[in-house]
């Protein structure tokens, strides 16, 4: 009798898991990180040309979904900074921590990271910290513009049945720790 109940429980749990795939599609942090690695080409010149300008290249972006703050994505990454000013040229590396709000565009089947902002930044060499503080508003504006225009993840109909279904039936997104869930029903 116990074996029967155990078998029945296995069948029911299998059905529930199978039905779950019919009601939602889940994108993991790892999938977002892979997409960011492929798509991130942030390279920007900011500042006042001729007086002080900086070329910034963002690399090694890694996401944490909904872990630090509900409904937000936290990104960490590196940035190379080449600074030219009236005082000469300098190079630096930065460690950045960014926060953004993931937003789903149903028409494009894409997740964008909007309201992007730098929440923490350290620079090496340390003597460049004051320069970084001066550039931060420009960097925030550039990052916000870049990520508002370029999706972090795009659903593809040719990738998998679940992803194709998500692109057709998506009703928005839900941010959960470690994943973004795309429900097919309200």
Swiss-Prot record:
Covalent lipid adducts (S-diacylglycerol cysteine), residues? 19
Topology term for the membrane: Lipid-anchor
Question: Mind telling me which InterPro entries this protein's record contains?
Answer: DUF1439
A Pfam family matched in the record: DUF1439
**What range does the record give for the signal peptide?**
1-18
Q: What is this protein called?
A: Uncharacterized lipoprotein YceB
Q: What is the lineage of its organism?
A: Bacteria, Pseudomonadati, Pseudomonadota, Gammaproteobacteria, Enterobacterales
Q: Which domain of life is it from?
A: Bacteria
């Amino acid at each position: 009798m116990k074996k029967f109940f155990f078998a029945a429980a296995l069948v029911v749990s299998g059905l529930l898991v199978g039905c779950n795939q019919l009601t939602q599609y889940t994108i993991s942090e790892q999938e977002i990180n892979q997409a960011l690695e492929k798509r991130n080409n942030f390279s920007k010149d900011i500042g006042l040309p001729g007086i002080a300008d900086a070329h910034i290249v963002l690399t090694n972006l890694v996401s944490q979904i909904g872990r630090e703050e509900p409904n937000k994505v936290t990104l960490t990454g590196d940035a190379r900074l080449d600074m030219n000013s009236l005082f000469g040229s300098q190079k630096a590396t930065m460690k950045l921590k960014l926060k953004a709000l993931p937003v789903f565009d149903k028409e494009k089947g894409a997740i964008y990271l909007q309201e992007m902002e730098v929440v923490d930044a350290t620079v090496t060499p340390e003597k460049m910290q004051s320069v970084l503080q001066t550039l931060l508003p420009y960097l925030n504006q550039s990052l916000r513009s870049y990520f508002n225009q370029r999706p972090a993840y795009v659903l593809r109909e040719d990738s998998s049945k679940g992803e194709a279904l998500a692109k057709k039936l998506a009703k928005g997104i839900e941010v959960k720790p470690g994943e973004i869930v795309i429900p097919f029903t309200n």
